[in-house]
């Protein structure tokens, strides 16, 4: 079983405060009430992908705004949304912090600083995209000489190594053109609830014939006539088209199929990209009918074990939770290592603190069968 992240403590990240999960597993089902922090939990894990790269932090901050074609907030505003509001701190103070144990090493991530008003020199003024939609009305005929900015330090400690980087990011800064270090601590892949609508899921699947055959078998749950996955070029545009070969209909573009097939292919591609790393699946049940849960989840568990992938999965659906628990025959595996943990998140709104209850899959399965245990609360 792949367990690359052994434990996690989120000191502060978005709406999560003082959340401790002392033991993580190969398959981690993250559940809880609305607004308890399930998606934020996955985003915090993404900080461990490349903790010393501030661009990685900005990329995480921008993820929720990625589908907004118009009217999205600025990169600076996105960054500020990562910091939880704390009435006990000075109004300008900001801090993100988490600790984890990854592959036997202790890891610390801490971004701490203040929001303040700064002067913009002539060089920085000239770099402001004054004709962008967001800034056009604001600037009109004048260029701002001052603005709001976050100034602080990013501290990262991995084992005995420590790195401290000075950070300065103001309200007219952009993400475009920033350096990407690619010093990945962990290979972490995140799948948003609607990533399957973006396309681009074939490339990793097609390079591995045995894995492609396994994916085709899963797709046959939806349509028994599917026999192959192909990538063809459009004769007019020369652009690649993701296609499905059908024994009766011939070659069909993937776009002609429903969201369920696209969702399964998105997950399959995510597993292939997360080899020897971590896969984060947000709202796994999206676009999948409950009658397919057990077969698809069995595929996820099998493929993740094969490729050495630790997986974290959020869900609102009790049927999805039961579907995952059903892939293990707990009546016959008594005493064996349980690959599944169910992590229930809960937020105390009076203290703003977050809590986690971690139960084994076997414990939840038995209590679901005997008492109808509601694990999501």
Where does each model-flagged region fall?
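Switch/communication elements of ASCE P-loop NTPase nucleotide-binding domains
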Residues: 1-55, 251-376
């Amino acid at each position: 079983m792949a367990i690359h992240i052994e434990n996690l403590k989120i000191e502060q990240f978005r709406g999560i405060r003082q959340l401790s999960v002392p033991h993580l597993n190969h398959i981690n089902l993250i559940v809880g009430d609305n607004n308890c922090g399930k998606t934020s939990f996955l985003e915090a894990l993404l900080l461990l992908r490349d903790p010393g790269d501030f661009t990685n932090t900005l990329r995480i901050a921008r993820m929720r705004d990625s589908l907004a074609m118009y009217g999205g907030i600025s990169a600076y505003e996105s960054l500020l949304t990562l910091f939880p509001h704390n009435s006990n701190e000075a109004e300008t103070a900001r801090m993100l912090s988490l600790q984890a144990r990854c592959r036997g090493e202790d890891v610390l991530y801490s971004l701490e600083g203040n929001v303040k008003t700064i002067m913009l020199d002539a060089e920085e003024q000239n770099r402001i995209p004054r004709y962008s939609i967001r800034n056009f009305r604001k600037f009109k005929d004048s260029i701002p000489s001052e603005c709001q900015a976050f100034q602080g330090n990013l501290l990262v400690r991995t084992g005995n190594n420590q790195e401290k980087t000075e950070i300065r990011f103001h309200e007219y800064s952009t993400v475009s053109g920033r350096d990407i270090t690619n010093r990945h601590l962990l290979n972490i892949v995140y799948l948003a609830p609607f990533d399957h609508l973006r396309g681009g899921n074939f490339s990793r699947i097609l390079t591995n014939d045995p894995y492609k055959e396994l994916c085709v078998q899963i797709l046959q749950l939806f349509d028994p006539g599917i026999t192959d996955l192909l990538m063809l070029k459009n004769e007019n545009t020369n652009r690649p088209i993701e296609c499905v070969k059908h024994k009766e209909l011939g070659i069909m573009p993937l776009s002609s199929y429903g969201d369920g097939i696209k969702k399964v292919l998105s997950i399959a591609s995510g597993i292939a990209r997360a080899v020897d790393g971590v896969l984060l699946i947000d709202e796994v049940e999206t676009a999948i009918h409950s009658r397919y849960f057990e077969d698809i989840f069995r595929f996820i568990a099998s493929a993740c074990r094969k490729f050495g992938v630790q997986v974290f999965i959020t869900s609102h659906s009790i049927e999805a939770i039961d579907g995952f628990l059903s892939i293990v025959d707990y009546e016959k595996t008594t005493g064996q290592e349980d690959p599944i943990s169910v992590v229930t998140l809960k937020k105390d709104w009076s203290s703003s603190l977050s809590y986690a209850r971690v139960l084994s899959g076997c414990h939840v399965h038995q209590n679901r069968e005997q008492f109808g245990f509601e694990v999501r609360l």
